[in-house]
């Protein structure tokens, strides 16, 4: 059974997918992480909801710069108490 999305989750994921389809191909691959920041944002919103997922995505995007080594950075699980 598919999980239903709230209207805010739908809006946020649609905006991110729009970025993936229309803007990202023009800019080319720039993300230092696996999964990419946009995929991370969609997964974080699905797992944690809109507010907390967007917060995780913002923190991740702020780490995505040339001085950070990047690498693997999965979305923390929902029941993880360290992600407050």
Swiss-Prot record:
Record-annotated disulphide pairs: none
Family matches, as SMART domains: Haemolytic (SM01234)
Gene Ontology cellular component annotations, sorted alphabetically: plasma membrane
Bilayer disposition of the protein: Peripheral membrane protein
Presence of keyword Cytoplasm: no
Keywords: Cell inner membrane, Cell membrane, Membrane
InterPro entries to which the protein is assigned, alphabetical: Membr_insert_effic_factor_YidD (IPR002696)
Cited Pfam families: YidD (PF01809)
Subcellular location: Cell inner membrane
Protein task: Could be involved in insertion of integral membrane proteins into the membrane.
PANTHER family, per the entry: MEMBRANE PROTEIN INSERTION EFFICIENCY FACTOR-RELATED (PTHR33383:SF1)
Family: Belongs to the UPF0161 family.
Xref: HAMAP family: UPF0161_YidD
Matches recorded under NCBIfam families: membrane protein insertion efficiency factor YidD
UniProt name for this protein: Putative membrane protein insertion efficiency factor
Organism encoding this protein: Shewanella baltica (strain OS155 / ATCC BAA-1091)
């Amino acid at each position: 059974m598919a999980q239903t999305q709230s209207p805010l989750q739908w809006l946020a994921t649609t905006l991110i997918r729009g970025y993936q389809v229309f803007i990202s191909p023009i800019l080319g691959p720039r993300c230092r992480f696996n999964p990419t920041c946009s995929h991370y944002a969609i997964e974080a919103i699905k797992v944690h909801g809109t507010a907390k997922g967007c917060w995780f995505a913002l923190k991740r995007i702020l780490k995505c710069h040339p001085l950070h080594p990047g690498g693997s950075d999965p979305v923390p699980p929902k029941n993880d108490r360290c992600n407050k």
